[in-house]
Amino acid sequence: MTPVGVQFLVNAGPGSAAGERAERIARMVDGDAIVTYRKGTRRADAVAMAREVARNAPEVVYAMDLAVAPVAAWALDGGRRRLIVDTGDAPLAFLELIGASATRRAMARALESVGYGRSDLVIVRGRYHAEQLHAAGHHHVSVVADGVDLDLLQPKEVTDLRTQLGLDRRMTVGVQGNFTWYPKLGGGLGWDLVQAIGRHDLDIDAVFIGEGPGLAQLRLMAERLGVGDRVHMMGRVAYSQLATYLSLCDVTLLTQTDDPSSWARTTGKLPTYLATGRYVVATRVGTAVDLLEPEHLLDYRGHWDTTYPDRLARKLGELAHDRDRTIARGLALRSLAESFDYDRIARSCASEIARVCERSAGSPARLTLGAGL
């Protein structure tokens, strides 16, 4: 079999945000590229991916996310290929935030040691993550932001869908993503919105787009607060339909806790919200600080701020008072999405791959990972 230039190992399945990024970059690579996805358990996928790497003999292994399966696959192949890690997360800092077990934290520490320490290049999505890595002594770092398809993600006319869902002329606030839940913290994605509506009896409807175990908890929370009829769960939406469902939302939320993991972490939510012309309310953390005007930013105090829903409620009340202005201000944000255009982002990543391939240094040393990974 003819060796390929780049093999992308995606820590998710087809249709995922990580998969979309990998496919986009692969199309820009000068040479053959293969994209391989997760299918089962971490251990089984690591072994299967390693076999694929050995069979394809790529010059570069591109790990999409700093995660066990893709990094372990590279190591199980003997660490013979050049390795690029593309990540928007700081695993260890996040696990410390949610109070994960010592075993999980040790695994994350080992993963970061390999991913940051043995790779030829680390691509991060924001400058704050790059600054953290530089401070830790890792200087083979480039910043390439999250991407968005500006042709596909545009504001849509959704009057009929609003009527169908009982949202006609209602102020709507949306959150899109994977709805996790952290019992030790007492919340997860979207909890601040439910609390804001419930604590202050806001005449506002919440729209949650995505799936995950946190949705059931949000439903229970809304029912306990007496606002269950104001919470609407759209479920998982195909990327091709995402703009339609986001266009249901007058306002969108990007809530990041004020701690090292969140300053490092970026998501595709912000460019997606901007591309669809949604008004964004974000915490004053990370990339949002660099992009948005002060009117869009709220303070968040520490790693878990139980008073934040009250500040959010006041802001949402102000926005609901002049809904037409809020909608117009959201549409004006679309110009900010241009810097996240996927063609530009994919070309930047492809250029980074080319630079790694051009280096004259030898391949990374062989290594093995402990059974704990």
What are these regions (language model features)?
Residues 47-54, 77, 91, 102-122, ...:
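Membrane-proximal helix-turn-helix segments that form the acceptor-binding/catalytic region
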Residues 7-9, 123, 167-197, 207:
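Conserved donor-binding/catalytic core segment of Leloir-type glycosyltransferases
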Residues 20, 303, 321-354:
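A charged, aromatic-enriched C-terminal amphipathic alpha-helix characteristic of glycosyltransferases
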Residues 154-167:
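A short helix/loop element that forms part of the nucleotide-sugar donor recognition site in Leloir-type
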Residues 216-243:
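Nucleotide-activated donor-binding/catalytic signature segment of Leloir-type glycosyltransferases, i.e.
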Residues 183-189, 240-244, 252-271, 281-291:
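Nucleotide-sugar-dependent
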Residues 128, 147:
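Carbohydrate-associated surface elements
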